[in-house]
Amino acid sequence: MASSMMSNAATAVAVAATSGGAQANMVAPFNGLKSIASFPVTRKSNDITSIASNGGRVQCMQVWPPVGKKKFETLSYLPPLSDAQLLAQVQYLLNKGWIPCIEFELEHPFVYRENHRSPGYQDGRYWTMWKLPMYGCTDPAQVLNEVEEAKKAYPTAFIRIIGFDNKRQVQCVSFIAYKPADSY
């Protein structure tokens, strides 16, 4: 009896080995709910004009020239502002509720590094304040009159106008109001 059990077990092992093993009786693995062949396939090219939304204009874009032109403040990429444009900018900062302040710099009107070489540290961020901030000012012409006084007192200085938000305690806008004639 033991020999017949042994031969039946040996026969079962031999049959299982020849017919693909134990996996012959198992269910096929799960491959997903739908066949991939039923979905449409689109092929994308690696052409730059298909990626850029402005098409052929990509090649005509230029950056700020690094030689001979210094970047000072907001709007420094524009030509010098006229008196009417300055009035409009000052009116904008007054409409926002910001306090106008006038500053000037005689030597280095742009950000530079001199005293320290660590990243993020730059000299030239702080200019000399012209008088006090103009608290309560509501007339942009009054701000431009102060700019004219600063020009007369320091004709070789760069002069900028700052809009300061006293609620958030931050400087919100800063732009050059006057550059000397021989400036770079």
Swiss-Prot record:
Pfam families: RbcS, RuBisCO_small. Keywords: Calvin cycle, Carbon dioxide fixation, Chloroplast, Photorespiration, Photosynthesis, Plastid, Transit peptide. InterPro entries: RuBisCO_ssu (IPR024681), RuBisCO_ssu_dom (IPR000894), RuBisCO_ssu_N (IPR024680), RuBisCO_ssu_sf (IPR036385). Residues 1-59 form a transit peptide. GO terms for biological process: photorespiration; reductive pentose-phosphate cycle. It is found in: Plastid, Chloroplast. The keyword Chloroplast applies. It comes from the Eukaryota. GO terms for cellular component: chloroplast. The basic functional RuBisCO is composed of a large chain homodimer in a 'head-to-tail' conformation. In form I RuBisCO this homodimer is arranged in a barrel-like tetramer with the small subunits forming a tetrameric 'cap' on each end of the 'barrel'. Heterohexadecamer of 8 large and 8 small subunits. This is Ribulose bisphosphate carboxylase small subunit, chloroplastic 2. It comes from Amaranthus hypochondriacus (Prince-of-Wales feather). The gene is RBCS2.
